[in-house]
Amino acid sequence: HAFVGSNIVEQPGELRKYDVSMGGTKWKPELPTAEKMNSLIEEYQNSLSTNATDTILTFMCKLMKMQAFNDGNKRTSMLVANHELIKKGKGILSIADEDRIEFGTRLIKYYENEESIEELKQFLYKKCLDGVNSNT
């Protein structure tokens, strides 16, 4: 986040220290902690051997939902996901302009209901992920 947010956001690379509201929902993320961030990273690293693509998308969605930083959470999460996807030869994630509203709607649904992550990931697989075999 420090790299992505440099000269763009306040306190790049630092965890958010205040409550925030999200547009389009009454849901509010908890304050992030170093322990929660480390736990998410550890969960990601421990799951990579099963299905790398699914693990990367899950990590991205959870990082977005965490809202760890003051700004740039979706940008940072997508850049990290694309870095990992490319590194593992699993394609690239890109949300087309015509899919942005549906993506936002599905993301908010996931924020409000943890179980909706599978619907969000299926949308990402079908409409936003190019050059990937979804079974690996």
Language-model segments: which ranges?
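FIC/Doc superfamily catalytic core
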Residues: H1-T136
